[in-house]
Amino acid sequence: MNPNQKIITIGSVSLTIATVCFLMQIAILVTTVTLHFRQYECDSPANNQVMPCEPTIIERNITEIVYLNNTTIEKEICPKLVEYRNWSKPQCKITGFAPFSKDNSIRLSAGGDIWVTREPYVSCDPGKCYQFALGQGTTLDNKHSNDTIHDRIPHRTLLMNELGVPFHLGTRQVCIAWSSSSCHDGKAWLHVCVTGDDKNATASFIYDGRLVDSIGSWSQNILRTQESECVCINGTCTVVMTDGSASGRADTRILFIEEGKIVHISPLSGSAQHVEECSCYPRYPGVRCICRDNWKGSNRPVVDINVEDYSIDSSYVCSGLVGDTPRNNDRSSNSNCRNPNNERGNHGVKGWAFDDGNDVWMGRTISKDLRSGYETFKVIGGWSTPNSKSQINRQVIVDSDNRSGYSGIFSVEGKSCINRCFYVELIRGREQETRVWWTSNSIVVFCGTSGTYGTGSWPDGADINLMPI
């Protein structure tokens, strides 16, 4: 090859390499610009339309680093959109309940600064469970704890902690309340907080940390709500509220709330005569509540809520083994599914039950007269057959020698089904334990299991003689 041919060949190769490098630089530039603009867009699986990432609530923010020819490109991966909960999965099949959590608040109060509380409950967001209670504006080892047996004072606030964390001095006070309910719609927490004068109380609706709506007393007689979790389906949350006599006719209404705003109010309808302190759970596409009849019945009222058309129906749990306290003994107690049984109906205690086909799972105090002990069991035909009394799978949660109190339900969504859990309030102090001047509680929590389980008793466990007076 002569010198001229060499020069031409080298020049051609150099030109080819230069062209390839130029095209690569253009490709890198186009890729960089494309990825820069695409980080603010993501595909919506619902309708295949491009949706902006920035205004959506995200669960996680992942940055993926891509290396191209010594050029670093940061690509933001659009996260999964947070959606409203719809609770459409089936209810888990269970054989009974297994221990889940216990906060030991009273025992810890003997040597630490723990809030005086009552009316506890549990509710979960999509990732974590929390315990709530109504604080008395004081810790136990504090003279302000004297005479905290009273339910309604302006210093009471709703407390919120991660489940299993006692209400210490650093606990968040969510709102002012002597009656409350809380639930998570999949995007944010809703808190319903009642406080004020007995004859003119106010319910505040706090959503995502902001007060959005309110409603005043409609019967001027202690406006009150569930003292356990409300339920949200597809962005609509339902809460049962009562205003009126605690031992006679009262005005119960079901409020429908969307992102903290009241969108509809339905009156109670059906055959229930008195409804208070409902324990509610999702029963897709609606909500079902098991409540307290403080007037006529020791059998528990059932309230069925249609979230789509706002209609309400009510009845009573069919089981002849009734759930309220006080009550008749099991041999003489009755329930016909439709009406209060007129058996020791005046007074009562918050409780829970839930349907399982034609059967019913329920919890109640072991004592038929006092808030002592706690048991759970399943009643065959207890949801569909009047006065059914065939009991199976009984468990003792708190032995009969120890105090209990309110109890309620909460639901946890798993990968394939919705599990039912319950808590029991373990009251200590006045009125029964007169050595001390305070009244407070701890809690124990159980959840449904499809496995096997053993036996035991999980009382509060504090020695009252070691407690501050």
Curated annotation (Swiss-Prot):
It catalyses: Hydrolysis of alpha-(2->3)-, alpha-(2->6)-, alpha-(2->8)- glycosidic linkages of terminal sialic acid residues in oligosaccharides, glycoproteins, glycolipids, colominic acid and synthetic substrates. Residues 36-88 are annotated as: Hypervariable stalk region. Substrate binds at R118, R152, E276, E277, R292, R371. Keywords: Calcium, Disulfide bond, Glycoprotein, Glycosidase, Host cell membrane, Host membrane, Hydrolase, Membrane, Metal-binding, Signal-anchor, Transmembrane, Transmembrane helix, Virion. Residues 323-350 are annotated as: Disordered. Residues 331-343 have a biased composition (Low complexity). One of its GO terms (cellular component) is membrane. Residues 1-9 are intravirion. Signal peptide: none annotated. Pfam families: Neur. Disulfide bonds join C92-C417, C124-C129, C183-C230, C232-C237, C278-C291, C280-C289, C318-C337, C421-C447. The active site is at D151 (proton donor/acceptor), Y406 (nucleophile). Glycans are attached at N61, N69, N70, N86, N146, N200, N234, N402. It is a single-pass type II membrane protein. It is an enzyme of class 3 (hydrolase). Catalyzes the removal of terminal sialic acid residues from viral and cellular glycoconjugates. Cleaves off the terminal sialic acids on the glycosylated HA during virus budding to facilitate virus release. Additionally helps virus spread through the circulation by further removing sialic acids from the cell surface. These cleavages prevent self-aggregation and ensure the efficient spread of the progeny virus from cell to cell. Otherwise, infection would be limited to one round of replication. This is Neuraminidase.
